[in-house]
Amino acid sequence: MCRSINSRPGPQPPEPLGGNAMKQYVITISRQFGSMGRSIAQALAQQLNIDFYDRDIVEETARRMGLPVSVISDTEENAKSVYFRRIYPLGMGVPNLRDEIFLVQKNIIRDLAAKSSCIVVGRCGGSILADMPNRLGVYVYAPYSQRLQNCTQKLGMDEATARRMIREVDRARELYHRRYCPEVKDVFTDHDLMLDSSRFGVEGSARLLAHIAQTLFET
């Protein structure tokens, strides 16, 4: 379920999934590029009837910082931003502004998690919300061949573009986490569950995670 951040209501009691009330909770999802982690998060949000945040965080960051959405989207996990190469051709100021973007997003993520049950995709959400008592951290991955197939068949990329995107986006996310979550030494840290999406598909993965959330967070 995805609405504008500013149009969403304040704290609401979590919707019951299987007839029993649920505590307020948050699910953080990290993923390999092409593993369909974002699609799984969307399907999971629909099954649990809770909010899903990904692109919304970018838009809210742009609003708070007074920058174009395209700038935030291009730079939040990309050290080779076209915008920053143009504004800071010698690299001066880039780290500080990228750090500011991260700090703004960190505050947004914490605000959203405090407001109501939700799913947060990427952006070191697992590390940022590691102190939350009712948090489920999920890492979605898949074999390279399956990710390549997802990119070409489901995301409409040609094979050369898919291979390049898998390589570059995975690397960018690794560098992003290394900079802003230095305490996270490997993909197991801050994740309670590693999910191979090739085994279950998008809907099957979402159903599995919904069942786990119900088991963990029912009152």
Task: Label every model-predicted segment.
Residues 29-42:
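Glycine-rich phosphate-binding P-loop
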